[in-house]
Amino acid sequence: MIKTYLFLAGAVFFEVAGTMLLPVTQNFTKLVPTAALTFFYLCAFYLLTFVTDKIPIAIMYATWSGLGIFTIAILGYVFFKQTLAWQAVLGLFLIVLGVILVNSFTGKVS
């Protein structure tokens, strides 16, 4: 199961890397960042294919998207100086809490 979560973490990493390149592509007019973005997204989805065998797709997708959103918000603040209201920050932490709860109780409740 550890290997599955490593694949999921890799998918989150590649999805975040691709998303962070979106502004750099300048509406897909810059070839190198666009190619890198495409490569990163393909890697993310490739890794997700290994996760779907072990984790229910709803749990996998909630984890992947939730952790991606949280990470992108932090990196957006660091690299692009994007700020969030305290309510948005609270919401991001609730997403992480939700991901933890969903993964903690998957398969234990019928």
Question: Where is each model-derived feature located?
Answer:
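Polytopic alpha-helical membrane proteins, predominantly small-molecule transporters/carriers
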Residues: 1-110
